[in-house]
Amino acid sequence: MADAKVKVLIVDDDAFLSGIYATKLELEGFAVISARDGEDGLKAAMKEKPAMILLDVLMPKLDGFEVLKRLKADAETKDIPVIMLTNLGQKEDIEKGLADGAVDYLIKAHFVPAEAVDKIKKVLNLP
């Protein structure tokens, strides 16, 4: 990541967890943008055009599934890969996220930030 840093948008109302992921991503050389709810997440995605979005599901204003649908319905954001990062681990939730266009679905309790960073790098074809 020589000159321009790759931008990752984290949309999560959990400031503590979001901060942990942001720190790990920044240490790996990414530029991180954070949003605390679905509405702000959509606005940030439109404005910043990140290379990747980490998206929580349970959030105020708009939930992650609705944010994902709107991102995928908009020509400007439809090609941004989205990884769902949530505590919702029911089979139906996972299937819904993937069917709606997420490239991966990570359950927070099952992954540490380093593993999420590895998945981001894999999706973006980064070393």
Task: Identify the meaning behind each predicted range.
Residues 59:
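Receiver (REC) domain active-site loop signature in two-component systems and cognate sites
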Residues 4-16, 21-25, 53:
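Conserved acidic segment of CheY-like receiver
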Residues 29-36, 44:
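Short hydrophobic/Thr-rich beta-strand motif most characteristic of the beta2 strand and flanking loop
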Residues 48-54:
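Active-site beta3 strand of CheY-like receiver
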Residues 56, 86:
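Active-site residues of response regulator receiver
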Residues 1-7, 114-127:
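Non-catalytic signal-transmission and effector/linker regions of two-component phosphorelay proteins
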